[in-house]
Amino acid sequence: MHHVLRPIAFRLALVSPLRSLTITHHHLFFTKRTMASSARTYNDAIDALNSLQTPFAVIEARRKAGIRPDAHSVKEMRAYLARIGYSSQDLDRLNIVHVAGTKGKGGTCAFVDSILTRHQRTHGIPRRIGLFTSPHLIAVRERIRIDSKPISEELFARYFFEVWDRLETSQLAKDEVELGSKPIYARYLTLMSYHVYLSEGVDVAIYETGIGGEYDATNVVDRPVVSGISTLGIDHVFVLGDTVDKIAWHKAGIMKTGSPAFTIEQVPSATQVLKDRAVEKGVDLKILDVDPRLNGVKIRPDAVFQKKNATLAIALAETALKKLDPSFKPGTDSLSPEFVQGLEQVVWRGRCEVKEEDQAVWHLDGAHTVDSLKVAGRWFVEECVKKAKGGPKVLIFNQQGRSEAVDFLDGLCNTVKSADPEGTGFSHVIFCTNVTYATTGYKKDFVNHQYNPKDIENMTQQRVFAERWSTLDPSANVMLIPTIEEAINKARSLVDTTEGEQKVQALITGSLHLVGGALGILEKADAL
C-alpha cells in the first residue's frame, strides 16, 4: 500500500498502516514484600533495573539547561561503591584493562578477552576473566561476562539484588548521595559488575567505557593494569563536544599515572590532545602502527580498521599477561598460537555478522557513526559481490533519538553506490523503530524510557530519514515500517522466487539496539 505523506513531497511506501504503538513507560514500584522476597527472579531484576532509567522528559530538560556529566558523576560512583562495601583500592584486585574510544572499543575488548581466554586454556592464567561492555544486544546480562560467557540469569538476579539491598540500607557517604538512592541504569550495571567480579574471583577484567572516559561510570579505577584508546571520531556530541579534539580530551581521562597506555594512529588534532593529556597525567602513552606480526593472521573483516583494533588488543593483552603470568614472553617476530587463535576465532555478535536463510542473506552491523557506517556499507557490498547470489539490496536502518543521525545517511548511501559494481545501491530502504515485535512490543531487556514515546508512535525520526533518502536516491523504494519484526518480514517478501538462486541481500545497521532486536527475531531465541 502506497501513501503520499504530507508535507513530504516524495514517493513513500507505508507498510502496515501507522497504528498506535503502545509504548508503555512503566516506572515500576516495588513493594517491601516483593523486594525482600528470597524468590526474586531475573525478570524482577530487569523490572527494577528499568525503573532506574532516566525518563525522556528529564533528559530533555537537562539538555535544554546544558547540564552535562562532570567530575561529580565520578564522585557519586565512588560513594555508591563505598555503600556496597568496596573502595577503589579493592578494584585493583581485578587488574582492569580499561578501553575507551569512539569506534572499535567493543571489538578491541572482545579481542583482548578472546586472547586471554586462549592463554588461560593453555597456561591456566588468568584464573577467571571478566568482560564488561555496553550496550547489550539481546539480554542485559551479556554486559557482564565471565570467561567469555554472560553470567546466568540466576547469578544476575542474585548479585543485582545484593547490590540493591546494600544501597537501600547503607548509611555511608550520606553527604555525597541521598540515602537509599540508586545510580541510574548504566551506572548501576557498572557498580554491579564490580560486585560480581570481586565476588566471583575474577583476576583480570576488561572494561569498555560507556560514554567518554573522564566522567564515565567506569572511571573509578585508579590503577588499571593498562589503558587503551581506540579510533576517535564524532559521537555523543552533546555530552563530549562537537570536535575530535574535545572528544579526545574526554577519552584520555581513563589514562592513569603509573599505568601504561596505548592508542593507535588518530587524526593529528586528536593525537596532540592525547599526548598533552598523557604528559599532564605522567603517563607513558605509546602510539601504535599496525602490528607487523598480524601478517598472515586471518582478521575478520580483513580491513585496516579491524587490524588497528587487533593491534591495540595485542598490546593490551601482552601488558596484562606480563603482570599476571611471570613466564609470559611476547613473541618478537610472530604472535604465539594463543594470540593468533584469539584474534581469528573471536566472537563479537552484531558486528560484521552474516546470517543466511532460504530467502535472504542478512548482514548485521551495529555501526552508529558517520565513519563506521561507511565502513559497514563497503563491507556489505564486498560480501554481496563474494556471494554473487543477485537479488534486491535492502537496507533496514534506525538511529533513535539523535537528530544528527540524518546526516549519517549521505555517507552510507554514497559509499554503497560507489562500491557497488552495478552502481545501483539499495533498491529498497526500510526505516523502522527499535520496537521489536508487532503484537507484543518490547522484550523487557529492550525497554527504553529515554526516547520520546510520541516520536516513536508517530515515527517522527523515521520520516526525517525517509525524506533525506528519497532526496539522495529518488529511484529507491523507501518504506516506513513500525517494528523490527515487520521490517524483516517485508524484506523477506522482496525476493523474486522465479529467479532461481536469488536471495534478498539485506544490511541491518545504524544501531546496536536495532541489530540486537533483529538477531533475536532471526534466531527466535536469545542470541547469546
Swiss-Prot record:
Binding site for Mg(2+) 1: S134, E208
Cellular compartment(s): Mitochondrion inner membrane; Mitochondrion matrix; Cytoplasm
Organism superkingdom: Eukaryota
Binding site for Mg(2+) 2: H236
GO biological process, one term: one-carbon metabolic process
Residues reported to bind ATP: G104, K105, G106, G107, R351, D365
Record EC number: 6.3.2.17
Matches recorded under NCBIfam families: folC
Protein name (record): Folylpolyglutamate synthase
Species this protein is from: Neurospora crassa (strain ATCC 24698 / 74-OR23-1A / CBS 708.71 / DSM 1257 / FGSC 987)
